[in-house]
């Protein structure tokens, strides 16, 4: 399943890029579906920054998935490679549940548009429900779309609310 979202931010690209990369933890109060973000690792090297962040989400688990997904499992690793030379961020999301069954990755482009920035988020999510503990083989085909929709339902709005949160953060730190 494709993930595609665009956000226009009323700040210059260099400010948006650096703030998105460096101030993510400070955005949590502005992110309604996120409980916390933990920076686990950061490596800076000649215009490229590699990061590992752990995101902890808020969200209701669908009834059909409650026997499989526990509330403490609704978090994910965010592996990111920020490249300032081409204003991109390659990312890979690894959920704490169904790690071997879920593949999610993509690339964000920070596009300059005058004094503003357009953040283009592009990615792909794939789920294989076969082999997930607790999922009967005969139901795997029916449950996979529910789980996929749940994960995309958590990720996509958060991708856009991060941009909204970033604008609120930048607005509150002007001057």
Regions found by a protein language model. Give the residues of each.
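Helix-adjacent hinge/juxtasegments
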Residues: 62-85
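A conserved amphipathic terminal alpha-helix motif
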Residues: 84, 137-175
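Beta-strand/loop substructures that line and gate deep hydrophobic ligand-binding cavities in soluble
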Residues: 51-52, 76, 81, 90-149
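Soluble, non-transmembrane catalytic domains of enzymes that act on hydrophobic metabolites at membranes
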Residues: 2, 40-43, 96, 103, ...
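Subset-of-secretome marker
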Residues: 40-49, 54, 124, 149-164
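Hydrophobic ligand-binding cavity/cleft-lining segments
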Residues: 1-64, 70
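Residue-level preference for beta-strand/loop junctions
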Residues: 1, 72-74, 102
């Amino acid at each position: 399943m494709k993930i595609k979202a665009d956000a226009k931010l009323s700040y210059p690209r260099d400010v948006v890029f650096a703030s998105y990369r460096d101030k993510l933890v400070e955005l949590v109060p502005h992110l309604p579906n996120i409980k916390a973000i933990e920076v686990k690792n950061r490596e800076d090297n000649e215009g490229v920054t590699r990061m590992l962040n752990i995101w902890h989400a808020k969200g209701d688990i669908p009834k059909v998935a409650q026997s499989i997904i526990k509330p403490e499992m609704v978090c994910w690793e965010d592996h990111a490679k920020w490249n300032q030379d081409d204003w991109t961020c390659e990312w890979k999301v690894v959920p704490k549940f169904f790690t071997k069954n879920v593949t999610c990755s993509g690339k964000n482009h920070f596009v300059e548009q005058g004094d503003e920035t357009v953040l283009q988020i592009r990615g792909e999510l794939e789920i294989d429900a076969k082999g997930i503990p607790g999922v009967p083989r005969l139901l795997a085909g029916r449950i996979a779309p529910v789980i996929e929709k749940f994960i995309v339902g958590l990720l996509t709005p958060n991708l856009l609310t991060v941009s909204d949160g970033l604008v609120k953060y930048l607005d509150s730190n002007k001057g």
